[in-house]
Amino acid sequence: MDIGKLVTRRSSEHPAGAFLFEPSVLIPFERAWRDQQLWQQRLFEEPSSPEAVWILQHPACYTLGRGASAQHLHFDPNEPPAPLHRIDRGGEVTHHLPGQLVAYPVLDLQRHTPDLHLYLRQLELVVIDVLRDLGLQGECLPGLTGVWVGRCKVAAIGVGCRRWITQHGLALNVDCELQGFAEITPCGLVGHQVGRLCDWMPGLRVSDVQPLLRQSLAARFHLAWIPQA
């Protein structure tokens, strides 16, 4: 399968309106998670409601997926170095922090393609598109989820989905500090190095990458951002 040819059911000539939330301050993980849950519930109750996407940064924290193993934590979970959250996404442990862009699409996959595997591949392509715009070559590794540049993983992906409505999403390391990743085995992948885009492009900042991520999400999922009053 050529994932580069994956498309959604929605025509790019008729993009659907979606709300885009881009707070200018760091958003605690639990607040962003609550907002996604509320929007997911809104789509359950009002199926014709617009979809929504959050692009933001978190203060330092760690999250564990539904079935994630505590063996990938290199600290006592009762005394974590930063807040630790057990959440309703797939995947193992990951680290969020300033300098990392996260994108949380709350989409109704029945409006796109109701296939979680394809949705994960689309999120990877969102990141690969951004890297291409920056002149970097991103790639996926067989059997693994995420995006690598060279031997370094620069983007982690983990989603939750109920009744085909998604939450959680992707985390792209731009100019974040990497020390906190040493406290875990990121995504449960032993021997895989974590990287950040500024390692290849010194001086690159989140503000440089965020417009590209916004553009790639809109293009891949055929979304038109609804102006907010």
From Swiss-Prot:
Disulfide bonds: none
Protein name, as recorded: Octanoyltransferase
Residues annotated as catalytic: C187 (acyl-thioester intermediate)
Reactions it catalyzes: octanoyl-[ACP] + L-lysyl-[protein] = N(6)-octanoyl-L-lysyl-[protein] + holo-[ACP] + H(+)
Catalytic EC class: transferase
NCBIfam families per the UniProt record, alphabetical: lipB (TIGR00214)
Subcellular compartments: Cytoplasm
Gene Ontology annotations for the cellular component aspect, listed alphabetically: cytoplasm
SUPFAM superfamilies on file: Class II aaRS and biotin synthetases
Binding site for substrate: R89, G90, G91, E92, V93, T94, H95, H96, A156, I157, G158, G169, L170, A171
Function field: Catalyzes the transfer of endogenously produced octanoic acid from octanoyl-acyl-carrier-protein onto the lipoyl domains of lipoate-dependent enzymes. Lipoyl-ACP can also act as a substrate although octanoyl-ACP is likely to be the physiological substrate.
Annotated metabolic or biological route of this protein: Protein modification; protein lipoylation via endogenous pathway; protein N(6)-(lipoyl)lysine from octanoyl-[acyl-carrier-protein]: step 1/2
Site positions for Lowers pKa of active site Cys: K153
Entry EC no(s): 2.3.1.181
Note: In the reaction, the free carboxyl group of octanoic acid is attached via an amide linkage to the epsilon-amino group of a specific lysine residue of lipoyl domains of lipoate-dependent enzymes.
PANTHER family xref list: LIPOYLTRANSFERASE 2, MITOCHONDRIAL-RELATED, OCTANOYLTRANSFERASE
Organism, as annotated: Synechococcus sp. (strain CC9902)
